[in-house]
């Protein structure tokens, strides 16, 4: 009351404060960071280790397992999972939430340094951190009209320019071939002079050096002396001297052909079917996609202005998606404001009343924006959606105050300025306790979110704080802006308001029906039990998912080819996949990037597409399942893609013995293939390929001074070549590679004919020290917490198939060492759902405590709390009706519902308590409902209708918060009925004759 009275007596001061609010609020919008999603730090570190030429089994044995053993006892590590593939080991460490990741990073680096000696010489593990916003910020396609060596041009001219941008963390180039100098050895000549590849590489390296040799005095100067033997032309390499083991000096040209050549550097890259060089750009963790986009586009314009033959196309820009998403949410918010003002007009019939509430909305939003910026939150889909939710909830307080002011005016005899002043002050005072109580109950439910450390806490903490900011701002607006505007505008309630007569008829009907219900309390209680039973029935069998995916209009086609597949077969598989993508009339453009044994097609769909992105992905998946020699997974890319997506059936088998696990997996796949209720059965080890394995005889090898490691290194050099040095020609750095002619060791017989040189210079055939055999090798080997795992997936052709497959196929094949495991997505869902369930339970308790303190009565608190369980029937029913599953956002909707659905009950019980001082209990129960039916309907309708645009999932990111809106719409709709018809009965049942008040001693 004191605040309201001060505001009414100092209007100029208030207006100036509001003006400052507008200025600082708008300023906060321009200074806020714009992002798709809140910046979430994933407590995960990834170890990458490359070992060229090693197969998955060797990688697992020599690299992955030693590292896993060393880091297995590290503090704070929750799960260790690894994938060993051809030439690469990737180990992911999932830490407990709340772990100091900087300290964890340092500890992990120290562990890796300690075991470096236990790893092969060429293996140098690297560690990188991960967060949810670490995807590609931009994708560029580069073409040039005149450059014949485009890869080197991009690598040496364009990439360095982009790397100067401070907001860029990483740049990856794909496609094209690079120029290099080939030192093509002649086998006969090498044998003639008894030389090895390493002899030639060392001679080339020694002939291209510059080293400091000290200092010398020259008069008054002290000059540095440098010894230089630099090769600057390709033809100069031919004259490099090489000393043979016999002491003879020969030239490089005597044993090798020297010429410029090209080789693939970045794999395959095509944009809309045309060969191109593609560049993917990742942002720094503390930067935004908007900053990266602006800086890159500016740099691209500079580069193209300097070179008219250069064309750089922005294939994908994440900032565009962010702006579109935020624009959609902003439009939804504006629509919610319009809906709220229209409802006010319907009930009061006076545009001034709509303006009063309309004035409080921007005031509350601006105060919230200032608070968001000060709290360090970004403007993203989550915080903007919170503002949309806030619009519906923040007008509740204003409506209650406005309706009370109208009622106070009707009771005033003075209709002049003094009368409006008194009505504004008195009307606000009557409901001040109710709006404070309802605001606190709404805000207090978000308190548990502040203590959640998991992904739920990181994602929804900004949403919770934003709604708290909105509700706090709305309370302040209701106590200040609404009374002041009421005094200034002097609105009058129209006698012929559109909802005037319907409300009067509704009040009359309510009095009659409530009079009957109070005579049939047992019937109401029986109906209550039926509602609870229906709630349980609706809740059972609901589909669950971690997070509803948004529709960004991007489809990701992940392609994994069989290891060792010939280049022409790879091209055939890629061409088939490209043909399916390019033939779709939904596609605007697409980018293919392939390297090693895997690649991806990123398809960017048209804005005016007629199909949902998920539907396009499902259609392509069916068409691509028949492409030979590869495994293809098609999915819709979303802002939450790091959470993964499950399509159809999936089971993960865990076992300690790989051979046994593989045998069981093959048997399960065979049995599933024979069934008709599943199709497209795939196994994570199905891309097996035969490899050539050298089984070294340690005794024979030692006799010639050889080891398995030295033999492996020699073969790797002979098959892959040695990078001996680098030349700078015409300003370009060109690698000099010592290699044998292409096809020299293409067949197994060629490899068997290799002659090795022992440490004593003695020659020995490879087959004398090792057996060359064929073995079946998996494309990759996966492990989780030390146990091997194989994933089997399939698509359903019928209903209720999962339980049948588990009972008829999976369970009978399990043994003592093999079990069913959970993937990371399922583990995450279980953990995050548990956290949200606890948060909801704590929120219910806090709401109970707040209301008990507000009413100074546990009894009244219990009465109002009954609205919570009964409102769930509306939430589950609407979820079932719309086909929306239970997800993190829908569970958050239940959390919000706990704090909002009780507001009508609070208003009703507070009014009954006021009326009981002048009325009997029965009359007070009936008249309180009839009197408050209008504000209850107004506040509920504004909240519910303002959420409808969000429930319709309008815009690309609309589906992210759709479940939240549906839960609240259904719950609040039923909550109105509970507050008006069931709470009065509970009040009557729990009411007792009040105890005699103890008089004050004073």
Language-model features: locations:
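Signature of alpha-helical transmembrane segments and their immediate interfacial
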Residues: 1-34, 429-431, 452, 484, ...
């Amino acid at each position: 009351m004191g605040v309201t009275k001060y505001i009414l007596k100092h209007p100029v001061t208030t207006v100036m404060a509001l003006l400052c609010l507008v200025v600082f609020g708008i300023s906060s919008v321009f200074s806020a960071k714009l992002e798709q999603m809140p910046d979430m730090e994933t407590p995960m570190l990834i170890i990458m280790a490359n070992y060229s030429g090693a197969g998955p089994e060797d990688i697992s044995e020599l690299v992955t397992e030693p590292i896993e053993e060393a880091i297995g006892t590290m503090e704070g590590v929750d799960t260790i999972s690894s994938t060993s593939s051809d030439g690469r080991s990737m180990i992911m460490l999932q830490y407990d939430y709340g772990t100091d990741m900087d300290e964890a990073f340092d500890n992990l680096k120290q562990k890796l340094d300690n075991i470096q000696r236990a790893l092969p010489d060429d293996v140098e593990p690297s560690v990188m951190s991960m967060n949810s916003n670490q995807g590609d910020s931009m994708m560029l396609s580069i073409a040039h009209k005149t450059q014949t060596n485009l890869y080197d041009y991009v690598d040496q001219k364009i990439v360095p320019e982009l790397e100067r941008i401070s907001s860029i963390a990483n740049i990856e180039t794909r496609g094209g071939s690079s120029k290099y100098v080939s030192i093509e050895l002649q086998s006969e000549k090498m044998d003639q002079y008894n030389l090895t590849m390493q002899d030639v590489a060392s001679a080339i390296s020694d002939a291209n050096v510059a080293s400091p040799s000290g200092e010398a005095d020259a008069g008054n100067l002290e000059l540095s002396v440098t010894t230089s033997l630099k090769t600057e032309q390709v033809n100069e390499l031919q004259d490099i001297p090489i000393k043979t083991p016999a002491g003879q000096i020969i030239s490089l040209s005597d044993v090798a052909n020297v010429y410029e050549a090209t080789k693939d550097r970045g794999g395959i890259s095509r944009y809309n079917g045309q060969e191109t060089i593609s560049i993917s750009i990742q942002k720094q963790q503390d930067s935004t996609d908007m900053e990266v986009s602006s800086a890159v586009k500016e740099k691209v314009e500079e580069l193209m202005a300097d070179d008219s033959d250069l064309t750089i196309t922005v294939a994908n820009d994440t900032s565009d998606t962010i702006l579109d998403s935020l624009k959609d949410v902003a439009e939804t918010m504006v629509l919610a404001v319009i809906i709220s003002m229209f409802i006010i007009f319907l009930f009061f019939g006076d545009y001034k009343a709509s303006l009063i509430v309309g004035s409080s909305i921007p005031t509350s939003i601006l105060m919230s924006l200032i608070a968001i910026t000060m709290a360090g939150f970004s403007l993203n889909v989550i915080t903007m959606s919170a503002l949309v939710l806030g619009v519906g909830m923040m007008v509740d307080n204003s409506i209650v105050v406005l309706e009370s002011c109208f009622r106070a005016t009707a009771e005033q005899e003075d209709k002049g300025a003094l009368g409006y002043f008194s009505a504004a002050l008195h009307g606000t005072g009557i409901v001040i306790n109710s709006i404070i109580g309802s605001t606190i109950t709404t805000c207090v439910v978000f308190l548990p979110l502040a203590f959640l450390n998991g992904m739920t806490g990181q994602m929804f903490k900004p949403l919770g704080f934003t709604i708290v900011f909105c509700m706090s701002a709305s309370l302040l607006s209701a106590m200040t802006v609404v009374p002041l505007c009421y005094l200034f505008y002097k609105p009058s309630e129209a006698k012929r308001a559109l909802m005037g007569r319907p409300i009067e008829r509704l009040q009359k009907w309510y009095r009659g029906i409530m009079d009957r219900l109070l005579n049939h309390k047992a019937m109401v209680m029986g109906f209550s039990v039926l509602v609870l039973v229906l709630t349980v029935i609706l809740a059972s069998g609901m589909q669950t998912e971690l997070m509803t995916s948004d529709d960004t209009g991007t489809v990701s086609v992940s392609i994994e080819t069989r290891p060792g597949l010939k280049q022409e077969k790879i091209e055939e598989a890629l061409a088939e996949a490209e043909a399916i993508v390019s033939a779709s009339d939904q596609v605007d453009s697409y980018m293919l990037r392939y390297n090693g044994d895997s690649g991806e097609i990123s398809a960017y769909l048209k804005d005016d597409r007629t199909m949902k992105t998920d539907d396009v992905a499902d259609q392509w998946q069916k068409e691509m399942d028949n492409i030979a020699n590869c495994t293809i997974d098609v999915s819709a890319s979303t802002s939450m893609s790091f959470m993964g997506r499950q399509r159809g059936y999936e089971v993960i088998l865990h076992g300690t013995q790989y051979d046994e696990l593989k045998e069981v997996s093959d048997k399960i796949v065979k049995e599933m293939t024979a069934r008709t209720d599943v199709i497209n059965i795939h196994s994570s080890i199905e891309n097996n390929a035969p490899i050539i394995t050298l089984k070294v005889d340690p005794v024979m090898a030692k006799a010639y001074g050889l080891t398995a490691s030295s033999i492996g290194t020699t073969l790797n050099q002979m098959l892959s070549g040695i990078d001996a040095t680098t030349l700078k020609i015409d300003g370009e750095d060109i690698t000099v590679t010592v290699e044998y002619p292409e096809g020299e060791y293409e067949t197994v017989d060629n490899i068997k004919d290799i002659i090795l040189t022992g440490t004593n210079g003695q020659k020995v055939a490879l087959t004398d020290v090792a057996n060359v055999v064929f073995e079946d090798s998996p494309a990759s080997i996966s492990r989780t917490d030390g146990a091997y795992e194989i994933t089997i997936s399939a698509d359903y052709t019928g209903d209720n198939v999962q339980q049948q497959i588990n009972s008829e196929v999976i369970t009978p094949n399990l043994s003592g060492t093999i079990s069913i495991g959970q993937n990371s997505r399922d583990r995450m869902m279980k953990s995050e759902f548990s956290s949200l369930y606890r948060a909801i339970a704590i929120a219910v308790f806090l709401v109970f405590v707040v209301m008990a303190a507000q009413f100074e009565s546990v009894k009244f608190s219990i009465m109002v709390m009954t609205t919570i369980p009964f409102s769930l029937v509306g939430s589950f029913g609407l979820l079932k009706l719309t086909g929306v599953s239970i997800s993190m956002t829908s569970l958050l909707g239940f959390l919000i519902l706990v704090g909002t659905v009780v507001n009508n009950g609070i208003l009703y019980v507070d009014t009954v308590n006021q009326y009981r001082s002048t009325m009997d209990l029965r009359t007070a129960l009936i008249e309180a409902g009839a009197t408050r039916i209008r504000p209850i309907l107004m506040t509920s309708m504004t909240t519910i209708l303002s959420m409808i645009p969000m429930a319709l999932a309008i815009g690309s990111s609309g589906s992210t918060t759709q479940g939240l809106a549906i839960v609240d719409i259904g719950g609040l709709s039923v909550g109105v009925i509970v507050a008006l018809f069931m709470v009065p009965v509970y009040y009557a049942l729990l009411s007792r004759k009040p105890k005699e008040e103890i008089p004050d001693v004073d």
